[in-house]
Each structure stands twice: as C-alpha cells, then as structure tokens.
Amino acid sequence: MTGNKYGSAAAVRREVAEYLRPPRRMPVAEGIKQFMFVPRGANTAVPWDDTLTPYMNEAINTLSKREYDAVIFAGPARTGKTLGLIDGWIVYGIVCDPADMLVVQMTETKAREHSKTRLARTFHHSPEVRKRLSPSRNDNNVHDKMFRDGSFLKIGWPSITVFSSSDYKRVALTDYDRFPEDIDGEGDGFSLASKRTTTFMSAGMTLAESSPGREITDVKWRRSSPHEAPPTTGILSLYNRGDRRRWYWQIG
C-alpha cells in the first residue's frame, strides 16, 4: 500500500511569515557583510570583508538614507565599486528590504556576463539569498530574477525599452561613463533611471558608479570650490551636482 504525502500547513505558514516581516533595520554595509559571499572562481566563495575597501562603507550606507535620492561614486577601476555598491546592494535588498530593482550594465553582453558569472555565483554561495529565489525555472533567467516574496530583479543595458514603463525602488547604473551620452534620443541614462524611482518618493534610490572616462570640456578650467571635478559629462558631472564627498588617506 502506498502512503500519500501531504503538505504541512504549519510549514507553509512559517514560510509565508518569513516574507511578511518588515525590513531589517541595519546599515547596508552590515547587511552585506552578514549575508553576501563573494565568489572566488566557480566553486569557492568568501564572506564580504569591508576592511579591504573601507572607503566603500560610507557610500554603501548612504544607499538606504531617505534624505538622499541618489548616490554617485567616481573612482578608479578595480577598487570594489561594482562588488560593494552593485552586487552588495542587490544582496542587501533581497535579504533585508525586498523590492523591485533594476541594474543597468554598459552593454547587453556585459549584462549577460554579470548575471551568469558574478550574480549567479554570488546567489549560489550566499545561503540567505539562495533560499529566497523562486523555485520556478520560468522565474529565473539571465536578465530577470523573481523571488519568493514577489520582488523582481532586472539586469539590463542602456536602451529606452529597459528604461521605460516599469517602476523600481532601486536603480543601479554601473560603468556609467561607458553608457551612450544620449540613449535612443531620449536623454542621458541617469535622468531616465531617476524617473523609474519617483513612485517610491523618498524611499526610491538611484545609484551611478564609474571610473571617469569622458573628455574635459574646458582645458583652461580652474577649481573654484572644494572637491570640484573638471567640467565634463558622465559620472563627474553627476558628482559635481552632489555634496562632493572625498575619501582621504592618512599617511603616517
């Protein structure tokens, strides 16, 4: 005689209750440190270590502060910008404060690569993220990720199709100075991205990070205020519109 297996109402109740909890009130950098494992190749990973990139913590924590509507980070390549600000923010959002999010890479090829190598491996090695992924195969492909709580992650590239119609609480633009200056005749990427978060009012956040790569428009320019960047387009133009924080190293 074959026995029948039935679902447990208690188990379903516990699972549903997990996703009805309010957001975890912790600094974003602390959430990343607690929940994100950084892949080292395909099969190994290590916990995020914020002591390796201490200059990232203030920018990362500003991502959850409602008095700001954007974070602009300009810095050299290979300094942990994408890992901390992009991948880390994604992990924090999934575990601590679920909401729809759009990540925009500089090309469709880079969006696919980011999803299949960095994000897929990070999700696999981070237990709290892995258990929140939707079990349905149809809910998880290269550019679209659904989670058990109903939140959605889109990994796209600079096109008016990606920037149109949908609303997101969080939008992240990576390698911004490699974006087209005008996207499909509709404007710059940051302006288009910022419009996607307006529905969420002060809770919405737009992030742009990049190493500077645009031409200076006035070669005779001289700085007239602290931390002012040269006149140009792209990430430094956005940086000049903000409060212009800068990290200083203490020598000796």
Predicted regions and their residues:
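Phosphate/NTP-binding elements of NTP-utilizing enzymes
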Residues: 2-252
